[in-house]
Amino acid sequence: MKDIQSTPAQIAFPIDRVGVKGLKFPIQIQTRDIGMQHTVAIVDMGVDLSVSSRGTHMSRFVEVLQDWNEPLCCESLERLVKQTQKKLQSQHAYIAFFFPYFLHKRAPSTNMLSLFSYDCKLSAKSINYNIEFILELTVPVMTVCPCSKAISHEGAHSQRSEIYIQLRLEQFRFIEDFIVLAESSASSPLYSLLKRADEKYVTEDAFAHPKFVEDVVRNISSKLITVTDVLGFRVEVESFESIHAHNAFAYIEHEFIC
């Protein structure tokens, strides 16, 4: 059969990235405490395309992914990227896994156990077989306004906030290490299951540790800069203000060039 994709491009523009998006794929990922966690990822895959080809071979992306049967980490992702480059005969390749990562969390007072999910993304891109890894995660937390607490006779405004972390990694690190690092930098973590005694504890503990978004982003950055295998990072904290119709945010970037 005639292979139309392999004919020369009619317009002489090379394509930076072409491929498939939104592939659902079951994965395993190593946890610190409970071994392998099974979850479902959304996978994006892409390669560059020269002017010598009108189109890429879309089915080959799916073939490569179907043949890949390893727990997700930087080392296995590197092998997948290189195999994609080889199969698609490309100079550059990009693969990203978007997935929910689950932790068992105990309520602070009753010790009741429940699952809590975090949105994560592990991606890799290659340029002439040099590989760069990026781990991204979103950690929801609670923040209490220090100013509101200082000027009010009773209470202070509090709200749910989100911490967005992007990390340039030299090698894979346990995701929960970064989750704990982020949660400990805010006024309080969040929980799926809280009884009344737990609600009392969380409220009082959060009000004992008021934080601006500026405090949270600085706390996290000061910890990340000491972590081995983290080559650079971006951290943004966004607070969904309970007394305003707008949000507050703070952002720090350190040696994050990609």
UniProtKB/Swiss-Prot annotation:
Q: Does the keyword Hydrolase apply?
A: yes
Leading EC class: hydrolase
Q: In which pathway does it act?
A: Cofactor biosynthesis; 7,8-dihydroneopterin triphosphate biosynthesis; 7,8-dihydroneopterin triphosphate from GTP: step 1/1
Q: Which reaction does it catalyse?
A: GTP + H2O = 7,8-dihydroneopterin 3'-triphosphate + formate + H(+)
Q: What is its EC number?
A: 3.5.4.16
Site keyed May be catalytically important: positions: C145
For this chain, one GO molecular function annotation is: GTP cyclohydrolase I activity
Does the keyword field hold Hydrolase? Answer: yes
Signal peptide segment:
none
Which branch of life, at top level? Bacteria
Q: Which UniProt keywords apply?
A: Hydrolase
Q: Which GO terms describe its biological process?
A: tetrahydrofolate biosynthetic process
Classification via InterPro entries: GTP_cyclohydrolase_FolE2 (IPR022838), GTP_cyclohydrolase_FolE2/MptA (IPR003801)
Per the record, the similarity remark reads: Belongs to the GTP cyclohydrolase IV family.
Q: What does this protein do?
A: Converts GTP to 7,8-dihydroneopterin triphosphate.
Q: What is this protein called?
A: GTP cyclohydrolase FolE2
